[in-house]
């Protein structure tokens, strides 16, 4: 019997529940386990026969308003979904959008890092993927002031290798960006390119991967969307996600590379201001659910 797809509701006060509800009506998923507050998941499951509700909390929630209760509820759902992914009880996991405030007490900067930890994986990367542009981050949620001190050669190498493995070919064309303006301009604007990024690119090439770089970020994305590259490795969050969301604001998905099974999420937050208005766009949730269903 086919294992179910796991879906966490995200923050129940945000747009996650309504978008997931709509996506279930648009995607053939097979069996699904839906994790979240009991009254929320049971309500959604009543409209979708293939969905099994897994109640993980019971506190009342106010739609459109973040609260401690909604944050705790989102983490409870995530914890159960991640545990089932790690154990193999589900074949894949789609996580709904949560507020980073909810993870603060758990000492994890994002769902990516939390799920990887539960799965016992230390070598992982975050990819944001749309139909024409795919971007993997060498670092995830790191303050700009800390970047130069935290970026390592292994981070860059791992991001490149995991990207090629996800794309299914050593021949995948991977553009590796520089950290500094003009990729350092020969050391005028920093030495991270020479000390960290270029050695990682050379290692990728030596391992048989089609990687180039470090490239200036201001031109590499144009080349990527023009078809020169299959994916881009960016050094930090906004370097990669700014261009990605310009091209794929509504249809990109967030994929955790390096896990034993697929974990994917919509590429947006809980959007409390849109919750309950019917104005939130479901496309990213639909695309994420499609990928989870393939897994």
Describe each region flagged by the PLM:
Residues 128-158:
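Ligand-binding beta-strand-loop-alpha-helix segment within the catalytic cores
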Residues 1-112, 153-235, 239-254, 259-264, ...:
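Contiguous, glycine/small-aliphatic-enriched amphipathic segments in soluble metabolic enzymes
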Residues 112-123:
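A glycine-rich helix N-cap at a beta->alpha junction
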Residues 126-127, 291:
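Methionine-biased hydrophobic packing positions in alpha-helices, especially
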Residues 114, 126, 135-137, 261-263:
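Conserved hydrophobic/aromatic beta-strand scaffold that supports enzyme active sites
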